[in-house]
Amino acid sequence: MRVRSIVCGVTLGAGAAFIGRAALRTTEGPAVDGELFALVNAGRGPLADGLLGGVTELGSLYAAAAAAAALAISGRRRAAASALAAATGAWLLGQGAKKLVVRPRPHDANPHGTRMVIARPKGSSWPSSHPAVLTAFTHVAARELRLGTASRVGLAALDVSVASSRVYLGVHYPSDVASGLLMGRAVARLWPGSRRLDG
C-alpha cells in the first residue's frame, strides 16, 4: 500500500509539472490557458463576486489552521496535526515552485483584459497554492477520519470550487490551479503517518 501511495504521489506531482510546462512552454498552451481564463474571469455579477471572494479564503493556511483547531477541539488531534502539517508542506512546496517558475499573474500579463475582484497577490502565478493547501488538508483529514465516499466527494468539490475561484477572481490561470490541485493531492498521497485507505 505504501509503494502504491508513493507511485501515485510521484505520478500526480509529475502531472502538475507537465501541466505547468504545457501552459508555459508549448505553442498552444498560453493561448488555450488565456482563453479559458477569459471565459471564467468574465464575471457573473456582484453576488458571485462576493461568494467566490469568500470561498477562495478556504484555501489559505489560516483556514487550514482554523479547521485543524476545530478537529483538535473535537478530540481528533491526530487528524488535525497530520492534515495541518500536510497543508503546510503543500504551501511550502508551492512557494518553492514559484521561485523556480516565474510566471506573471494574469493582470501583469494583460492589465486591460483581466477583471480583478480581489487584491493582486505577490509572487509567481504558477502554481496556485490555495488549491494545493486545501487539497492536501482535505485528503489527509479524510483518510485520518475514515470518511466515506459521499464525504470525500463533497470535499473534492470544495477543492475544485476554491481552485475555480482563483481563476474567477483574476489571480490565476486555469493551468495554475490545475497544477495546484495535483500538487496538493501528491503531497497527501506521499504524506507519512496517515491511515492509508483505498479510494
Identify the residue ranges that each predicted region occupies.
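N-terminal transmembrane-helix/juxtamembrane module of multi-pass inner/ER membrane proteins
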Residues: 1-63, 95-123
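Interfacial segments of alpha-helical transmembrane regions
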Residues: 4, 69-93
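Short, aromatic-rich membrane-interface segments at the entry and exit
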Residues: 8, 78-84, 149-153, 174-175
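Alpha-helical transmembrane spans of integral membrane proteins, capturing the lipid-embedded, hydrophobic core
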Residues: 10, 14, 83, 87-91, ...
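Short hydrophobic alpha-helical membrane-entry/anchor segments
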Residues: 17-30, 72-77, 94-103, 143-146, ...
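Membrane-helix interface segments
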Residues: 47-48, 76-79, 107, 147-151
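Small-polar-interrupted transmembrane alpha-helices in polytopic inner-membrane proteins
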Residues: 85-101, 151-165
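Membrane-embedded catalytic cores of phosphoryl/pyrophosphoryl-handling enzymes
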Residues: 111-199
